[in-house]
């Protein structure tokens, strides 16, 4: 590690002067540090390593780096039990001595994680601090270790890759957070702005960045792993990163290149998103770390503001860069430049970091900007990197394509990065964005230099300059000059320029606090600028600054500039360049900010940067991204969103961007909001000052944008917009809006989306609050300010500004100044307890005040806010705490703020400071949910989070929720809880999406993040707890009591917390523990890792979990986003309200929120639900949110929670589909998170608390829901357990899902059950309870499972698995229908679980696949929010995901649909089922272990997202299935495990009257039996389709048996969705017949006297049933044609057993690629099982097929061809597997597979396609030339040279080669009705026969001649001599050895030698052609035999398979054969035409 620290140099340069500067920041960091303290030893070691390094060292050393380390390390890595105290002490001392200590903190943090890298980064005291502060939480996030290490190494030890790899790899990953530093940027930003902000920044940023970058994309998963397992971290990270960062990837590339090893590694390790989650905290730390370096360089001059800023900037940048280039950055920066360079490098990393940066970009951008400012990091990092990284921006560079634009802005920075010139150019370029990105990338490496130069120039100037046109112009020059002074100079240069120029225009505001530093140009600039810069951080930075500077114009400029940067993407680069232009767009933002133009400038700027940025920048960033956002939205949406969102800072940007994207107006608003949110980071700092307004605006926009951003974005947008509108009404509202936006912003981060959504919900509440516009505004503003406050200075300003919006800015500024300190302090408070004293009080007060009071300074404005906030204040406080969760939604802040500051608090919540919270909030807001929250959580329990994965976004949502819970998470669990609750309200909304679950998740998240944030988060909690928390929280965490203490501490929030507490507390507690007790933290981390592990098979879990997180998150996010808008708000609201109701006091804070939220959110929620199909969900969702929150803690389990949460959950479920993830996440995340945290933490500490709470909750639930009796609960618990078990099984399949599945199972069942309740929304409580219960149960179960596994996750998991397996059956023991019903219920639940699990699969798979997030993103963006998410998830994921999609689509709709009606009744039945689940949940909730399970839930979350729909589906089925349990029990475990959750997707279902009656083959295996009439409830049709599309559990279908309907329940087999006959019957007479609609199904098989069918995608052909397929050749051909169709059909959805294939087939048309991806795996797996079932199935099918063989051959053919092609493409994708499945389909005959089938399957290369083609021919078409001719006629020419034909031919040749080796091959194929080779063979034979018949028409063959031609394979043609009597005649002499046409073996009997035949010369060609066609197969066989002989002769002992494979690898030979075949057919066609 130390070597990482080579950073001595790094530290030295940075550390020396800057380090100290940053110390202030460091102090903030300290808070984190305190956490880290836990690892003093480690820390110290590292630190020592550092120590030499220097100031940083000293400061690192003494600072609580240990604390940080402890926090992180301990929490994350180590179990420094002592840590907590040390942490606290450190925190305090660090806070007190903030200056020096922070460094160590960071260092410590770094040390812990990657001490070296961390420390390196941390060396710079300031940055350290920042890092610490941010990093801690953030560090966990993702860049953390890798990035940190990586870039740190690179930078500092630029070339010290070892550290990178090593540290990075191990430490860094753990340190991912630092790596996250890159995420941290935002955090950094925040941090940077103020010390206090630092933390929040960090946190926020981390969240943002981590979450955003990583978080959003892969944060959850990515982070978590890193978090948990450092190493795993990397894996996920990549995935995440890539997603998250494309930038990362890109960055990685760039960065990697840059820092190269480090960077790369970074990518791997740090970049990997996982780190973000886990590393978020680290990230923060990293940020700090990074920052520190930056700080060192530039900070020295303006340490305070700058420090932060620089820190931010550096840090941000650094993180960004730091991520990858952190080292580089830092190292580079050794001096500023280095950092700049490094940063750039880092920027590259930034890419990775970008996310960080991106977020950071908010921060980083801000940070980067700041970094840029701060060092040139910013640019590097950020923007480009960031952006790039960010996705939002990073993407620009890299993966974010879209993001790039935003990134562009970042990029510009990056570009700047590229060079100062570039910087400006970049800045300018913003368009350059791309360039920037590039620049960045290039810059990155080059950036090292350039970056620094640019960094400098760019950073400061760049961002500013660039960002701002003004400074820009000046900037460029400046930058150049700056570059010279790289770090400082640049920083200063432009800093000043910026500062002054625009930077400072805005900066001035920041001035107040940061101004000075700001002034300290570099610092100020960075700081402010940075803030702004943040904004600028890319654009915002520039823009922000520009804007800032631009002030009015500038302001706008900043905004727009940001926008330009960002905007450019969004607005257009031009704006980027052209601030003004941007401004236009941005302006609104800015404008919005305008009021706070100046402040906004600053704020805006900061905000812009953060808020601004968020707003302007953010907006821009975001907006850029906004614009970009829009673009980004889709692409970025996830990436960017993730990145962006992750980069909430950018987030802000994202939000902003989102916002921007959202719309300038929105942007304006959003921007403002975003800015606020986004700005949060900036805002907190500068933004805070004024951005709040702007921020709010941005926030709003953010929300909108967010919404926009995500697929959900739109929803969210709507939501956000709604919010906006609601909020919009008043800017104040705006603030809320901002919050909302912010919230939305989260949404924007797909990942964050969840959070986002969740956040969103908060916004809605804020909207509601908007009603309290003024207050809101104030609140929001306050929130913003709070957020900003996070950056104390700005916050105050912001707050005032926010508060006053326009009016207060001034005060704000001053306040800011004050605040800076205070907030800083506050930040510090959280971060640096010492300052906290004031801050503490402040915090307390602020927190109390709702954060509105943020700091005393802010108080005044807070006061206004306070006024609003007061209630809110409490809330705020709580909110701050809770807001943490809320924070997740900056919106939380905003909304919370709106709510009452809750949001601020919430945001703040992330904040470790009440005020800070707000500040943080913004950060959080910006990055909070994802980054922060998630990061935090991630930091804390990245694993958990990851597990929650769903979590990332969900986490975010959860984070938001968690924030509610997060409050708990916050460490001030209780307070936060409560606050969170309120914020939760808003957050709830946020939570709503992830809501219930999320809450825990959030909590967890928070907890995780709270590590740092915990400090921060806890802070909010603590804040309420306030300073104490700050101090105390850390202490509390150490002891279990502390969490409780927290609760008490939360005193005021306590109630809320109380209710939330159990879960929350766990979270909080856990969080606190983690945070406070570093060791616990570490332990938790470890635990978490373990938990995670156990949850997801440790490593696998890690990665998968990570992935899962991501997928989950994505889906969740998507869901969140999609659902979020409604759900979040609604959920939040509902959640809140219900929760409050149920939770009552506990939810108290929330309650208010709830009230507010209830109203508006619900509507919103409803819509969301509506889309998601969760009308009830809306209510329930809300409920769920609340419930989630509460249940989240234990909540899900809570019956009451169940109700509330259930509702929410339900809602989420329904909407969740995608959103499911969120709720799941919320549930899973929340509960799991909480649990995990608690599990981890909770193990020690929370366990009791949680348990008590849970028990209490259970009691409550039971009281509330008598239905949920213990027995039932127990039953359900068992069931859930079993369900979980399923997941475990599943997990086996998907490691990650394992745990998550566990949770998923719980969730799913819960969910499945839940949905009905949601349906019952009408019956809110019961229904919600049910749903919640279900969800809760699920979660609970998961929780329990996890919880149980908490201590030893793995063991637990295993036990759970076993238990589940054992219990599964008993699950319904309670139910009346014990067998049937139980089974049904189990089945439903299993299905739900399966669906959930599947998603986790998806998640894990996704996790495994970096693309997953992107995929998700795409899907998310794309159409069905749920579906896409799911599909995307699935798609990206694996077959399972697709499965999920397939199953879910139908399910969700039906579930919801049926549910509405059935649910009410079902609730009772479900009572057994649902209630049971609920009780289960409750028990689960009640049991502390559940908290651990929650971690699984997070994984589940991803799963859950899909599952929810399935759940709904399940629910309907549950309702019905409840009764019929057959299928479930049967495959619930295994089948469900894998496919349970998601089956292969199917585009649609053939419902009579609804589907086109085209004679299109329905595809898929199975036989259509006209005699079997199946129907489905009319109301279930939408659910069915949705479920099939998503792979979720569909509603049941019924077979008409005269006057009875036999129920067929859905299940998954081999990934395919099928329906199994049950013994449940309903009457079908009278009016019942009107309620059902005919459905077309294909009969698959009959096993154990049970029929299995699958729903057709299209109406099957109705061919006259041919009695039997004739084997007659003639007939055969027809059958061939006909059969072909069936095979085609089969093919389309290959064999059911091969669900994947089937899915593929079915889906291929639409999602062929997707299926292809997933399919292969599934088929492989299913393939073995398939045979048996399939054999029977095949037999049946065979008969059926025979019946239908007569179908129109032609259409069939055509279809077949078409499908074949699709299949083929799939096949290609799936390769053998695919083929296999395809062949299987050919199995349409339903014959048992041949014994060799497996081998063949493996060998089958083109079988699938071949099967496709020939699938139909029943008999050897060879012999018969008749029937198929028609069909074949159509096919030949068309298929001749198609890929399908080639594949078919390949399969044909493979079969012939096999036959050459094994003479009995063909016979065996025939006997077994092989579907792999027979279809292709028959198709080819059919073609030949068809052509032969055509040729025959031209000939008049005598029987003798024909017989001779047929008998002899050779034909000699002799022309008669001229002059001979027969001139003109030709002699045909048949020759050769007769052979058996069927087996191709020589006949043993002797044949009379053929005679000569004379034919006309003209006709001789026809004879030879006829002969060639007839014997083509044999001739080819002979060639194959020659080939095999040649191969066998050349090699020794080659097995048949090897020989076959070698032949098939001989491409030229195959081509030659195919060409000869094509020529032959072409010749035949030509001859047949002429004639």
UniProtKB/Swiss-Prot annotation:
Concerning InterPro entries, the annotation shows: DNA_MethProtect_Complex, DUF4211
User: Which species expresses this protein natively?
Assistant: Mus musculus
Q: Which GO terms describe its molecular function?
A: DNA binding
* Tissues where this protein is expressed: Expressed in brain.
Gly residues composition-biased segments: 365-377, 540-555, 670-681
GO cellular component terms?
A: neuron projection; nucleus; postsynaptic density
Q: Which PANTHER family match?
A: GLUTAMINE AND SERINE-RICH PROTEIN 1-RELATED, PROLINE-RICH PROTEIN 12
> Which protein are we looking at?
Proline-rich protein 12
Q: Report residue spans for region: Disordered.
A: 210-280, 292-311, 329-584, 645-685, 755-844, 851-870, 879-920, 946-1061, 1112-1244, 1288-1355, 1367-1567, 1662-1839
Q: Where is the composition biased (Low complexity)?
A: 249-261, 338-364, 408-429, 437-455, 1817-1828
**Composition bias, Pro residues:** 223-240, 296-305, 476-487, 830-841, 1031-1046, 1314-1329, 1449-1529, 1710-1730
Enumerate composition-biased segments (Basic and acidic residues).
1200-1214, 1535-1547, 1698-1709, 1731-1768
Q: Which domain of life is it from?
A: Eukaryota
Q: Where do Basic residues bias regions lie?
A: 1190-1199
Sites of the modification Phosphoserine? Answer: 330, 338, 648, 859, 1070, 1128, 1299, 1372-1373, 1378, 1562, 1924
Sequence ranges of Polar residues compositional bias: 490-501, 520-534, 1769-1779
Q: Which residues carry this modification: N6-acetyllysine?
A: 1214
Compartments where located: Nucleus; Postsynaptic density; Synapse, Synaptosome
Q: Which residues carry this modification: Phosphothreonine?
A: 735, 1295, 1555, 1699
